């Protein structure tokens, strides 16, 4: 549809406030291969790699190694693996097989909140003292395109990336601590389609 193509060009080339966006693709043309098998393979290939890199970066910044962790929590909404992403991360980081591993799937844009709430709960219950919290999205594995302007704008906004943080009951003296005082989230089912 020519109107859709014009909208896509305006969003991607215009002054939209987005300075960079990363996609875990070798070429932009790959983004238009939207068969279910390709999308699943894209997620299975890139989500573990992005999560592992974010985890390694967080561990380096915290002056820790993976054996120092008691738990790992991963959130995503752009794909599904069974067993989950934590099984891939466990393998790539050489995690203790008895470690607490939690996969949170389907929380959408606010996934960091339940992820951090679970980390907070594990720490304050005494079940863990160091929890690696990871959010990873491979939006190129969840692409859906049609002529709806909302769908087109969404496809142009989101990229493929991961972020991670180490949550601890004992903050490091070398790093500025962030203290969790309280967390709250609200679910509004009537706004699910926004």
Question: Each predicted region: which residue ranges?
Answer:
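Short glycine-rich or small-residue beta-strand-to-loop segments that form or flank ligand, phosphate
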Residues: 42, 70-76, 103
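Buried hydrophobic positions in well-ordered alpha/beta secondary-structure cores of metabolic enzymes
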Residues: 12, 69-72, 115, 135, ...
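Phosphate/pyrophosphate-binding loops at sites that engage ATP/ADP/AMP, CoA/4′-phosphopantetheine
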Residues: 54-69
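Active-site glycine-rich loop that binds ribose-phosphate moieties when present
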Residues: 104, 114-116, 135-160
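Condensing-enzyme catalytic core mediating Claisen C-C bond formation in acyl metabolism
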Residues: 1-44, 145-194
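Phosphate/oxyanion-binding active-site loops and adjacent basic polyanion-contact surfaces
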Residues: 43-52, 112
């Amino acid at each position: 549809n020519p109107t859709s193509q014009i909208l896509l060009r305006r969003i991607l080339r215009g002054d939209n406030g987005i300075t960079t966006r990363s996609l875990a693709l070798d070429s932009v043309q790959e983004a238009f291969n939207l068969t279910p098998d390709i999308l699943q393979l894209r997620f299975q290939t890139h989500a573990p790699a992005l999560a592992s890199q974010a985890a390694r970066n967080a561990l380096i910044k915290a002056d820790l190694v993976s054996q120092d962790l008691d738990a790992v929590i991963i959130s995503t909404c752009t794909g599904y693996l069974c067993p989950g992403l934590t099984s891939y991360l466990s393998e790539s980081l050489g995690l203790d097989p008895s470690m607490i591993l939690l996969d949170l799937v389907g929380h959408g844009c606010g996934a960091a909140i339940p992820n951090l709430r679970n980390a907070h709960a594990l720490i304050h219950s005494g079940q863990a003292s160091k929890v690696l919290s990871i959010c990873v999205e491979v939006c190129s594995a969840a692409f859906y395109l049609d002529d709806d302007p909302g769908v087109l704008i969404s496809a142009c906004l989101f990229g493929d990336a991961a972020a991670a943080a180490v949550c601890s009951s004992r903050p490091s003296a070398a790093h500025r601590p962030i203290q969790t005082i309280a967390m709250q989230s609200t679910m509004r089912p009537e706004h699910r389609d926004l």
